[in-house]
Amino acid sequence: MNAPRHYLQFKDFSRAEYDYLFSRTRWIKDRFKRYEPHHPLFDRTLVMIFEKASTRTRLSFEAGMQQLGGSAIYLNTRDSQLGRGEPVEDAAQVISRMSDIVMIRTFEQSIIERFAEYSRVPVINGLTNEYHPCQILADIFTFIEHRGPIQGKTVAWVGDSNNVCNTWLQAAEVLDFQVRVSTPPGYEVEPERAGLIGTGHFAHFDDPMEACRGADLVTTDVWTSMGFEAENEERMRDFADWQVDEDMMKVANPGAVFMHCLPAHRGEEVSAEVIDGPQSVVWDEAENRLHAQKALMEFLMIGKIEGDCA
């Protein structure tokens, strides 16, 4: 039995593999829009394990697997033995014998890595405190749809250096673009935690306006991620000057787009004028989670399919 491929961090795939995935996502999305069935995963089963609650992750994976002809089973740790102390290694061996692919959304990256080590089937990171590769897979596809290749472009990240930020930084190394990060003091990027090879693809800016100047894409996330609720009051004060507003978008490139992984808090990390404005592509970005993850699951379970991609 060959060892399965997993998708735990953005850097798990090469640039060539991402080129394929983006082309495949476009092909799958086009078929979806034409109401043409595509069932390469007929009779396959996805198990989704949630320790962190979600709307978009569950919906996109569950609907996506059904659209590919398979079925999806939802587990949360409160209602399973994982929440009662069963070792992750034991759960991985059992669950992977009863399914064809597993998606996990949890807190610690080490949990998903341990699960993958003992799994007989592919494991996908649906989100951890450290990384959110599926989100950036969809985000970059969305940028390509609207503005073309991301290679050589500039992304401005404004706000907390969280899991989404870490994944943007990994993506910059793999796909050769620049990320400018602006965070309040004390919230800076930790290159080792972000899993970076070097620091040549990102720069830190104390002033968020300068980070956005000339950017092709401006993006942010909530100021208080899940698991950090106890810090909310302090974070509201610390991040007050890091709201993406119309002034920041005005200094970006004229064709710049705005992204947010959602859910968003208007009036906190982004103004209503920006997220609901003409440069915002957040709804395409959210929909593309569905199509990008279909391409991802197909790739992990079947491999490259020649001839169908444009």
Language-model features, listed with the residues they occupy:
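Positively charged, low-complexity intrinsically disordered leader regions
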Residues: 1-59, 63, 131
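Active-site cofactor/substrate anionic-group-binding motifs, chiefly glycine-
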Residues: 45-46, 50-98
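Glycine-rich phosphate/diphosphate-binding loop of Rossmann-like nucleotide-binding domains
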Residues: 51-63, 145-220
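Active-site-proximal loop->helix
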Residues: 73-95, 118, 170-171, 188-200
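Anion-binding alpha/beta catalytic cores of soluble intermediary-metabolism enzymes, centered on
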Residues: 92-95, 100-171, 260
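Adenosine-phosphate binding glycine-rich loop
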Residues: 255-256, 261-310
